A protein has these predicted regions:
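Sec-dependent N-terminal signal peptides
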Residues: 3-12
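Extracellular/lumen-exposed scaffold segments
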Residues: 13-142
């Protein structure tokens, strides 16, 4: 009986064939200042969430980056801090920022590919899921 009940619950949570979840959270990239060739740059990654959704504090938001020719990354995997002083539950009230530290060997435009992973919940229906989205960290180096 429990098995049947479990299968029925999973069927209700599944999406119709061909449907996919909306991208709940998006990343915004902004350098802390002008990026100069040969100097370490701090790119601040901030986040915005679709109304009606919340982001879990744990597991942490992670950004896994891939090295590209001409750009040296201080870290290829960065996790956002799970602390949020305003939060009274497991969800963020104020989303954290992540700092990507990178050094480009010469002037030019670069895009550092990566994967942003986070867990979200829909406050209206209680649906929660893990989501991984492709991102590109833009670098305009002088």
């Amino acid at each position: 009986m429990q098995l049947v009940l479990g299968i029925l619950m999973l069927a209700q949570l599944s999406l119709p064939p061909g449907a996919s979840l909306p991208q709940v959270m998006s990343a915004n990239f902004k350098p802390a200042g002008a990026i100069k060739a040969g100097q370490k740059a701090d790119i601040v990654v901030s986040f915005t969430v679709i109304k009606g959704f919340v982001i879990d504090r744990t597991p942490q938001i992670t950004l896994k980056l891939s090295e590209v020719p001409g750009v040296k990354l201080a870290k290829t995997e960065i996790a956002a801090p799970p602390e949020d002083p305003k939060s009274k539950d497991e969800y963020f009230v104020d989303l954290p920022s992540i700092h990507v530290m990178a050094t480009a060997s010469k002037a030019g435009k670069y895009e550092v590919p990566g994967k942003l992973t986070y867990f979200f919940c829909n406050k209206a229906d209680g649906f929660c899921s893990k989501q991984t989205v492709d991102v590109k960290v833009p670098l305009l180096v002088q």
